[in-house]
Regions:
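Glycine-rich, basic loop-to-helix element that forms the pyrophosphate-binding segment
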Residues: 63-80
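The conserved acidic donor/metal-binding loop of glycosyltransferases
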Residues: 89-93
């Protein structure tokens, strides 16, 4: 159903992924969450992000070389296995517990190609 793609660089994305994973699990749909670090230095953020691999249908990957923002996003899109893609910045967080459900509702009940909103920095 949906691939959630999160490019990152030297940022702890575990809290975001944990929240999204919980919401996606409640929605009871097929999903994957992929976080891709763009070759940032190895540190505590990398250690925290490795824990993403412990969540079902989630994975953390790290580029060997820095691709830059655009190429990192494009690389993530190439890895997506579902037709619907939700691109999120690593420093965003859903404003509500219904964030994912709102997106799923729109996907299933309208014919638009692009949706945005419901986030805060």
């Amino acid at each position: 159903m949906i691939s959630v793609l999160i490019p990152t660089y030297d940022y702890n994305t575990l809290p975001l992924v944990t929240e999204l994973h919980q919401q996606l699990s409640v929605a009871d749909i097929a999903f994957e969450i992929i976080v891709q670090d763009d070759a940032s230095p190895l540190n505590s953020n990398t250690d925290n992000n490795q824990k993403i691999n412990l969540l079902s249908d989630c994975r953390f990957e790290r580029n060997d070389t820095n691709l830059g923002r655009g190429q990192n996003r494009n690389a993530l899109i190439q890895k997506a296995q579902f037709d619907w893609v939700l691109l999120m910045d690593c420093d965003m967080f859903p404003k509500s517990k219904g964030f994912i459900q709102n997106y799923i509702h729109q996907i299933q009940n309208s014919n638009h190609s692009v949706y945005f909103g419901g986030l805060q920095y």
